[in-house]
Amino acid sequence: MKFKNLALLLLITFSTITAYGNNVSTDPINDKNKEKAKETIVGVAASNDNFTTLVAAVKAANLVDVLNGDGPFTVFAPTNDAFGKLPEGTVYSLLKPENKKILTAVLTYHVVAGKFDAKAVVKAIKANNGKFVIKTVQGNSLTAMIKDGNVLLKDTKGNVSKVIMTDVEASNGIIHAIDTVVMPQ
């Protein structure tokens, strides 16, 4: 019995060392993220149940081709819960064809040209005395800051959103999930 346990322990140890030495990932979450990196921002968002409202909005605004483009883009992606915080009827109203221009402005306010992972955002905040002004594709800016260990985004109206998930890789950029929809001026 002792020999069997020792053999099993050696096998597990050897397998772990071999996998580590060959740089093979045994982390299913990490592997899944690497798989998704083959997909564009829209593909990654569409495969995540937390972004169904965002994906519907991107389709309604005819931004799928843009966000499937080469990029790179950084998207501060509002979750379904973030859209749920908006006043009742707001999402329904924004999705109407006659409000496409407004919807496009709101969505592109969440997109930044270039790829900024969480580490780069934090570094920029620290390098700029605690506030990093980010110009969005929409044209207005967001201000990134750190409070209580969380990265926050402040829009031009003074609304604040917290980054709740970072560094979701896509083939043409990166997604950071946020808990509140930010609004342009």
Labelled PLM ranges:
Residues M1-F3:
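N-terminal secretory signal peptides that target proteins for export/translocation
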Residues N5-L6, Y20-Q185:
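Mature, structured domains of secreted/extracytosolic soluble proteins
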Residues L9-T18:
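Bacterial N-terminal signal peptides
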